[in-house]
């Protein structure tokens, strides 16, 4: 798995400034040379074909959404945050990036690949889950939202972060 040059990179950005309290992207998904159904009547791009090879976010997003839907079907009690954390905590490493200079594979940073490449089967068996609500994003500093990633951005001298997890395999 590799991250292509046109992929978005982190850190998170809110439109005015970079936010160094959480990491983006969360994960990466397949998005290059994806065989997809196509309308043969379309005259704008490829005419007469029923399947074409496409790349970009339009191809990686359905992979991620499909993985999330499979997990929700298998675990109807999981919240969207639980599903996100399962995908993040079981993502596959290493993920490389393609060098724009010579096409060679280079190591990635967390700002290139997030937690790594999604692995729906591993996520299905995730042992620990994080949870948060939309209100947490509205009312808490980003560093205090119970995300599946922890990042110490701009720290003067000392900082503490904590996360709460629950077991997905054992119940009380």
Predicted regions and their residues:
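Loop-rich non-cytosolic ectodomains and luminal regions
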Residues: 1-172
């Amino acid at each position: 798995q590799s991250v292509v040059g046109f992929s978005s990179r982190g850190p998170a950005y809110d439109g005015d400034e970079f936010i160094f309290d959480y990491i983006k992207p969360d994960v990466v998904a397949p998005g290059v040379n994806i065989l997809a159904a196509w309308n043969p009547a379309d005259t704008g791009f490829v005419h007469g074909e029923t399947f074409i090879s496409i790349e970009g976010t339009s191809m990686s997003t359905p992979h991620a959404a499909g993985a999330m839907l499979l997990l929700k079907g298998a675990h109807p009690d999981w919240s969207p945050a639980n599903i996100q954390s399962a995908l993040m905590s079981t993502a596959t490493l290493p993920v490389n990036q393609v060098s724009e200079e010579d096409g060679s594979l280079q190591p990635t940073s967390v700002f290139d690949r997030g937690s790594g490449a999604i692995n729906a089967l591993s996520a299905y068996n995730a042992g620990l889950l994080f949870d948060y609500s939309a209100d947490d994003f509205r009312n808490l500093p980003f560093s205090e939202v119970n995300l599946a990633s922890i990042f110490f951005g701009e720290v003067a001298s000392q900082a503490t972060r904590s996360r709460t997890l629950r077991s997905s395999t054992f119940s009380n």
